Amino acid sequence: MDRRSMGETESGDAFLDLKKPPASKCPHRYTKEELLDIKELPHSKQRPSCLSEKYDSDGVWDPEKWHASLYPASGRSSPVESLKKELDTDRPSLVRRIVDPRERVKEDDLDVVLSPQRRSFGGGCHVTAAVSSRRSGSPLEKDSDGLRLLGGRRIGSGRIISARTFEKDHRLSDKDLRDLRDRDRERDFKDKRFRREFGDSKRVFGERRRNDSYTEEEPEWFSAGPTSQSETIELTGFDDKILEEDHKGRKRTRRRTASVKEGIVECNGGVAEEDEVEVILAQEPAADQEVPRDAVLPEQSPGDFDFNEFFNLDKVPCLASMIEDVLGEGSVSASRFSRWFSNPSRSGSRSSSLGSTPHEELERLAGLEQAILSPGQNSGNYFAPIPLEDHAENKVDILEMLQKAKVDLKPLLSSLSANKEKLKESSHSGVVLSVEEVEAGLKGLKVDQQVKNSTPFMAEHLEETLSAVTNNRQLKKDGDMTAFNKLVSTMKASGTLPSQPKVSRNLESHLMSPAEIPGQPVPKNILQELLGQPVQRPASSNLLSGLMGSLEPTTSLLGQRAPSPPLSQVFQTRAASADYLRPRIPSPIGFTPGPQQLLGDPFQGMRKPMSPITAQMSQLELQQAALEGLALPHDLAVQAANFYQPGFGKPQVDRTRDGFRNRQQRVTKSPAPVHRGNSSSPAPAASITSMLSPSFTPTSVIRKMYESKEKSKEEPASGKAALGDSKEDTQKASEENLLSSSSVPSADRDSSPTTNSKLSALQRSSCSTPLSQANRYTKEQDYRPKATGRKTPTLASPVPTTPFLRPVHQVPLVPHVPMVRPAHQLHPGLVQRMLAQGVHPQHLPSLLQTGVLPPGMDLSHLQGISGPILGQPFYPLPAASHPLLNPRPGTPLHLAMVQQQLQRSVLHPPGSGSHAAAVSVQTTPQNVPSRSGLPHMHSQLEHRPSQRSSSPVGLAKWFGSDVLQQPLPSMPAKVISVDELEYRQ
């Protein structure tokens, strides 16, 4: 026993600290020498009557056997090989319950006689499992048990499976059910086996015991170790392990037996006979202490074991307050360690800790200090271990952030209490913020600091992070919550915060930097630095934003959205919508393609003034956009290739097309994502269904969603943005994207030098920034009449906006690709608008083809028009409307030529070269992919819809231009072309 006692003194200072004579709770610590002396005392030599002879080895009560009886399942517990084998017999059935994959694999071996090292046999008793349950009894046990338990987790221990490991595995499985039965049976086994084998083999036994009854086949590290991340391994010597094992055994005994202390006495008594009479006393309390660690012994006095050492969170800035919050309502949700957090001496200090918590600080600002203590008064002891006084340092967290940000908290706090209940409820959800989340929140706050305008952003983060934290801290004081809630509610009231919590508040919400807020300075850099554009693909977004961004404001939007299917999304989103331009143009440079786009929703309140539709955008849609954006890299690369390689081959385009199709499917499937374009947030938000895999959303459902969203948008947006993007727009956006992707390269190539230069300039600028787009537009499109029924946002550059806002410039919509899709009926809104402008929808195709559109005609409607309706390459722009874009009637593109252009980008109307260049400049962003060589090819993003018919890209291979040129009969809006069906699927 000296070994054990020594082990205790050495390894378990903690144990010794905890030890006290059971009678008097005053702790008594034995020194190693004392224990050794005790070993030699006559009392130590006496055999207590309570010790059963069945645990004798060589006439001496063997604690090892006794422990083995306690945990039959642990190999250690059974020093005897045969015993282990018997235990192994249990293994098969137990193994089946084992979760560990390795063990599961072993199950297959159960019926196979394995090499002796494995000793895995099929059949047998299930005692081991019971043991395992016993073993896992107390956390301290787990520490050393971790070593044992690892049996189940052993890596590479295929061959080295000792009974012990099996037992461990079983321990992991159903322990409690068979506990008593197994223990008794195990005891019997061990008894017989020990008597039989250990009659005089004490030497062997001792050796084994020295190894902690490991069979010495496996190194300690091999089979021993934590079985879960929460466990810790205490590295100790073998003796220490034995000692700990003894403690565990005692603990288990105490737990198991009605008289816990008797059990300990028994084991200790036995031990005492071997050599440790007084250790009994010391260890019993130790066991008590150990159990409490498992929260098993509530009676432990707070001062017994000081966990402050472990949980001294003072050094950790926010942890203390967070833990406090978590533990806040000790009775309700006190952690299992809460018992050890109740140092009576500190119980009174809770208020001080609260006083220093950031929330309290906020409350102080709001004058809510009184409320702080409300939830946690009873839980003062729980927080006691954490030095509460130091929390003053921690308070920096939110309050300091806000102050640094120069956010005026007082107004916000004034109404914080309103939200208290709501936050409280949410706090009960028990959400715990991960470090990343907290950091994200803080980052948001920092952004706030830098951009005061972005207070909403900050507020949202505050709400999000704090609410999450408060969820953590639910237990934390209501008062704290109150302050925070007030803050949040105030923000909401002021419109800074979305009135309803975002469904998907995640990085995207963080990304929703104030930048997106139209009027606000764009903290793009801050956002990017802080968030690293986590959601957005920085590369793709930059690429897209560069390529597309410079091409058109819409493309800029695309750039913003870049992560989301850039072209398709933008197309679907009303590229022309002034909404985009407005927020965008004011600070074209400021917008980072990725984050901005995300920003769109979070500030619905803010943005709404900009575009009513924005509010409609749901965060989900934003998320969808972001998700879609993630899928973009390939498409972006392809698009980039198209953009940079004028002759980007048809096959490549097709590939792009597939990519777009997939992406678009996602987008299209997402109910309204595409039309979202109107919403100022660049991301065509995908609605919730977008969360669903497009393949799971019925086409009819998607269509309906689009229709409803389209209608809702058309009302508000009709004034400012071409509502042409209708469901058709969305449906065809994919085709358009394809077309546009092919068209720009061809445009580059075909357009006259002027066009090429412009396009190249566009490309360069596109790489540069949205601002460059604006400039470009200004240069090239300033000439354009902005008045044409288009609202020219007086933003940074009216011209750029114009092209977006309304395809006022009736750019020749050169559906360079035959519009193979059945023409969808024009959206009723479009029809009405067209009629209002004196154009009968039926005449539209011919008008467009002839290019004889009334000057006032707003082609933005055409966006929703399917290519098939428009049918032929359009040169809709009357010279008057767009002098630049005067298509020369003499050079109408034939579809065959268009196809060739698609393939070779060879054709461009001679006269349209420069104009087309301008147009393509506008549309290139969208058209970038578009195949038609004509710069005007879909030069109007607005016309994208008509250009949409990119299906011909693929069809041109199979059908002659004559066939492709023929406009398909227009079909009812409900009818979906095969192409669309395919896309949707």
Curated annotation (Swiss-Prot):
InterPro entries: eIF4E-T (IPR018862). Changing S693A: In S6A mutant; abolished phosphorylation by MAPK8/JNK1; impaired P-body assembly in response to oxidative stress. There is a cross-link at K410 (Glycyl lysine isopeptide (Lys-Gly) (interchain with G-Cter in SUMO2)). It comes from the Eukaryota. A motif (Nuclear localization signal) lies at residues 195-211. Changing S961A: Does not affect interaction with LSM14A. The modification N6-acetyllysine is found at K486. GO terms for cellular component: cytoplasm; cytosol; intracellular membrane-bounded organelle; membrane; nuclear speck; nucleus; P-body; PML body. Residues 707-717, 725-735 have a biased composition (Basic and acidic residues). It is found in: Cytoplasm, P-body; Cytoplasm; Nucleus; Nucleus, PML body. Residues 1-24, 208-230, 664-693, 707-803, 922-953 are annotated as: Disordered. One of its GO terms (molecular function) is mRNA binding. Residues 219-240 are annotated as: Interaction with DDX6. A motif (Nuclear export signal) lies at residues 438-447, 613-638. A motif (YXXXXLphi motif) lies at residues 30-36. Phosphorylation by MAPK8/JNK1 and or MAPK9/JNK2 in response to oxidative stress promotes P-body assembly. Phosphorylated during meiotic maturation. Residues 754-776 have a biased composition (Polar residues). The modification Phosphoserine is found at residues 5, 74, 78, 115, 120, 136, 138, 301, 345, 353, 374, 417, 513, 564, 587, 693, 752, 920, 951. GO terms for biological process: miRNA-mediated gene silencing by inhibition of translation; mRNA stabilization; negative regulation of deadenylation-dependent decapping of nuclear-transcribed mRNA; negative regulation of neuron differentiation; negative regulation of translation; neuron differentiation; P-body assembly; positive regulation of nuclear-transcribed mRNA poly(A) tail shortening. Residues 736-746 have a biased composition (Low complexity). Residues 695-713 are annotated as: Interaction with PATL1. Residues 131-161 are annotated as: Interaction with CSDE1. Residues 448-490, 940-985 are annotated as: Interaction with LSM14A. Pfam families: EIF4E-T. EIF4E-binding protein that regulates translation and stability of mRNAs in processing bodies (P-bodies). Plays a key role in P-bodies to coordinate the storage of translationally inactive mRNAs in the cytoplasm and prevent their degradation. Acts as a binding platform for multiple RNA-binding proteins: promotes deadenylation of mRNAs via its interaction with the CCR4-NOT complex, and blocks decapping via interaction with eIF4E (EIF4E and EIF4E2), thereby protecting deadenylated and repressed mRNAs from degradation. This is Eukaryotic translation initiation factor 4E transporter. It comes from Homo sapiens. The lineage of its organism: Eukaryota, Metazoa, Chordata, Craniata, Vertebrata.
